[in-house]
Amino acid sequence: MDSAQPGMNAAQQLVVVNASLERVYEQWSRFEDLPKFIPPLRGVRRIDDAHFSYISNLNGEGKKGIFHIVLQIPGRRIAWRTISDGFMSGVVFFEPHSEKKTEVTLKIRSIFDPPNLSRRVEEYLGNFKRLVENEEAIP
């Protein structure tokens, strides 16, 4: 990840989810469900196959924007970036750990909330793991 932009921070975390690669990828690729495990997201709505609008609230600051799916390799990788109001990009990788376990690696680069980015990425992955393994929404 390039850290040349001022105020930019990057974080990477990994989690092993006790579910098949297909189940894990399918859950993450339901972009409208991202708020179930990423609490600052209040809503995500599909615009077209590659663009989504979002509403977020991070540290009491509400934001609206659009993110673009720049790469989607089914069962392997999803990459995105925001195209409005600030900058954030990310990529999530899916690797089979065994027949019933999947390794999920999330990398994010952002100008939003840099001091806490690594902790937040870890929290989001933990929420995602619980969502998939328990098939329940995270408040």
Describe the role of every protein-language-model region:
Residues 68-71, 77-135, 139:
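Beta-strand/loop substructures that line and gate deep hydrophobic ligand-binding cavities in soluble
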Residues 14-18, 45, 55, 68, ...:
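Generic structural detector for well-ordered beta-strands
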Residues 10-12, 62-66, 87-91:
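Short, surface-exposed coil-to-beta transition loops
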Residues 46-53, 72-80:
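Short, hydrophobic/aromatic-rich segments at coil-to-beta transitions
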Residues 59-63, 112:
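Short, cysteine-centered beta-strand-loop-beta hairpins and adjacent loop/turn segments enriched
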Residues 7-9, 48, 61, 86, ...:
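Residue-level preference for beta-strand/loop junctions
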